[in-house]
Regions:
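Residue-level recognition of tetratricopeptide repeat
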Residues: 21, 55, 110, 147-150, ...
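Canonical positions in the second alpha-helix
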Residues: 5, 38-39, 72-73, 94, ...
Length: 255
């Protein structure tokens, strides 16, 4: 349907976005980037084009290009009303959990985090948290914001952020981020989560990449270096190379 709509009217912004998103879901990232680039030429003031192209620049590890796109998107949404972003792959309740503004700040923060520009990552995540208006988006943002604050040795701010997290949060899809945050709070048994992580049937799932990076990072943070590195190596040995947790594991394992 996305391709048919695009072929019928390739200048329509929504058609461009959905066709580009579909191409990306099929792993055709370079083609998706080309579609969004065309969309930018046609709709240079549409922040959505930069947001989606930036996402695929992230996927393909073109981090500086991703940052440029997300910064442009951020400048285009100033003083504009936020809007919920429809999911390409809906969750179990078919309820979108992220908005245009939250996605722009979230992905910009991630791009800065992956390039080790933690000051700018923290600023982006702070803005993202302010527009994370449901528990799912909140825990996803809090996860990366917490890691960033720790990198900056802002331990008091990191601990204060953790205090806003609790087991009773009603989530639709981001339960893995909550699990990891509860491990950081020492309210979730890391060894039990590790046992589940090592279950071969789960290897390669997106969930396992998210849990794996969080778990590996936790073990590194408490001085269990061998265990931490082993888990991170397992994350990047699995096929979820397009996930943000995989990218972060790559970065953590860099010499």
């Amino acid at each position: 349907v996305a391709k048919t709509n695009y072929e019928a009217d390739g200048s329509n912004a929504d058609h461009i976005i959905w066709y580009g998103r579909r191409l990306a879901y099929m792993g055709r990232y370079d083609e998706a980037i080309a579609i969004f680039t065309q969309g930018i030429a046609t709709h240079p003031k549409d922040a959505r084009m930069y947001r989606h192209r930036g996402h695929r620049y992230l996927t393909t590890r073109c981090y500086s290009k991703a940052i440029a796109d997300f910064e442009q998107a951020a400048s285009l949404i100033k003083r504009k009303k936020d809007e919920m972003e429809p999911d390409g792959m809906p969750n179990a309740k078919n309820i979108p959990t992220s908005s245009l503004h939250s996605n722009i700040w979230y992905h910009l923060g991630l791009a800065y985090y992956l390039t080790k520009d933690y000051q700018k990552a923290a600023a982006a995540y702070k803005k993202c948290l302010a527009v994370s208006n449901n528990p799912d988006m909140y825990v996803a943002t809090a996860n990366w914001y917490y890691l960033t604050l720790r990198k900056l040795d802002k331990d008091k701010a990191a601990d204060a952020l953790l205090k806003t997290i609790n087991r009773e949060m009603e989530l639709i899809e981001n339960t893995d981020y909550l699990t990891i945050l509860l491990i950081y709070k020492e309210q979730q048994n890391a060894a039990a989560v590790r046992t589940k992580f090592l279950d071969k049937d789960l290897t390669g799932t997106l969930s396992n990449a998210t849990i794996g990076f969080g778990l590996g990072n936790y073990f590194l943070s408490i001085g269990k270096i061998a265990e931490g590195k082993d888990i991170l190596q397992r994350v990047i040995a699995a096929p979820q190379w397009g996930s943000f947790a995989y990218m972060a594991a790559e970065m953590a394992l860099e010499k």
